[in-house]
Amino acid sequence: MEPEFPLEFLVSGTPISQQASSQSRTAWKNVIRAASTHALPEGHWLTEEPISITIFYFPAEPMAGDIDNIIKPILDSLTAHIYFDDRQVERLLVQRFEPEGIFSFDDPSPKLSEAIAGNKPSLYIRLSTDPFEELR
């Protein structure tokens, strides 16, 4: 059974950097995969569709590192878990929302609302098979 898109889920914890140890990266990838299982049907197939990914990071305190350093471990955790290959990713949006400056979303999904109101640090991850949906 193929996953139903869009697919949204939350990940608790501070993202690790691509420069972290192999052991830390593996542990973080397992955390992301475990968090995603609640949004996936049991025994799901990998999609072959083009993928759009939105990653919003809600840190507990101002982020010390660069936002671009957290992307690769997240994408690696989704490869061969939700989609076959990271070449399928046609669009990627990554943004952090510092604790003192939460943006007021016009119409957040229930899962995004949960991320905004929930415990920090956390990630909101959304996958879609329509890379052009926000351009319409």
Predicted segments, located by residue:
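Acidic, proline/glycine-enriched N-terminal capping motif
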Residues: 1-136
